UniProtKB/Swiss-Prot annotation:
Identification of the protein by name: 3-hydroxyacyl-[acyl-carrier-protein] dehydratase FabZ
Designated gene of the protein: fabZ
GO MF, one annotated term: (3R)-hydroxyacyl-[acyl-carrier-protein] dehydratase activity
Organism of origin: Thermoanaerobacter sp. (strain X514)
Keyword Lipid biosynthesis: yes
SUPFAM superfamilies according to UniProt: Thioesterase/thiol ester dehydrase-isomerase
Tagged with keyword Translocase: no
Amino acid sequence: MENKGIRKILPHRYPFLLVDRIIEIEEGKKAVGIKNVTANEPFFQGHFPDNPIMPGVLIVEALAQVAGIAVMNIEEFKGKLGLFTGIDKCRFKKVVRPGDQLVLEVLIDSIKMGLVKAKGVAKVGDEVAATAELMFIMTEEG
C-alpha cells in the first residue's frame, strides 16, 4: 500500500504522517510498514541540529500508525479514529538517524469492544531500534 492508500485510512498528514508504505497487512492481525527517515524531517531542526536523532516518541507514533492501518481496514472501524490509551514496556535500543529505513512491525494481540492491544517492533536493518506494547480505543471522534 502506497502513501495515497495510507492517507485514505489514516487522518494524519504531513508533518505527522510517519508511514511511507505498507509492505504487508493481515486485516486485524498484523501489518508491516516502512518509514524512510530523511535529513529533511522537520523534527531534525531541533533534535538535534548537529547530531540529528529521530525522537523515540515519534518511532512509537509510527508503530501506532501502522497498528491503526491494520485495524482501521476492518469494516466496523472504517472511518473511526484510534486514540492512544496506553503504552507499556517501551524500550529504545538504537538511535535512528537520517538515511535510515525504519521497518515497523506490528502484531495485533486483541480487539475487544473497540479497545486494541498490539505489540510493535521498529528495526533498522537487522537491529531493533524500539519495542512497545500499544493500546488504543477506536472511537467516532476525539
